[in-house]
């Protein structure tokens, strides 16, 4: 639904930015006052605004992929251009309305040009720096205690990854980097908390190469996954979706990909490791997937297991945490939030989720939310880091 409202907002923002830009360019050089030059700039600027929408309408292929990548980066530019130019215009307005309104400083052409250059440098630094930051994966360690016997295990080393968003932004290089970090942790088990794909199987540039990377994961007791809200086949624009009356499900090739890569998909079901520790995989609440209309409640899912043994729940989004804790779940692992992904959303994420990021105790149950390996929309992270989470679980 958000995608339907994105275009008018996009156009309004860029109209304001364009007015500011042309005013600034006219101060730079007289060539930017010529109609032909202005027309060329307007045409290029208009293309970038419409790029994401055009890409959503054309068939899958190299052209569509290139346009989607351009659109994603342009969306990131839009976010920071709107912020920086908006702040610059607000400061100028305050000065104009203040006692400095007649000051040469406020009216100076040189100051206006320097102000514009500063805005461009800041926007560029945020976009370029944010992109570089988004490509550098880190490992975050957690220590968790569960007051139950672990049976065969005194400790269990769990690596949690989520939000890979394999597709337009994330490809073989990032997945190889992820696999290397996973193997460095020497895990007992690897859990993938959904949003493995980015709404389209075709968006991956090298599915076979990515699959081979997954096969290199070294885990003593296997790799398990759940689906997230992006693990379905649907049209997206800048990470936002269109409404549909039809039930949205994963592309069958996504299911086959996991199977061939050696990843076990958990669909409202559990596995037990060495008859000692349960791992239960919950479907996504809004998009539970093929063959599931309504997922099990916390009480229902716990009733399928022996709660004398440790129960770890893996799901995409950190929801119903209090209910899960009350039902007897010992550890909850999830993703989805991206820790806000980029400034300023990283500051507001805490108002949107029960646990926006990291380790949070919900009654006696630890909840761990990872910021994710990949991202949706613009390939930019400012104020957050892409990560894998290395969770050291200690039993009684």
Go through each PLM region and give its residues.
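Soluble catalytic domains of enzymes that build or remodel membrane lipids, polysaccharides, and related
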Residues: 148-396
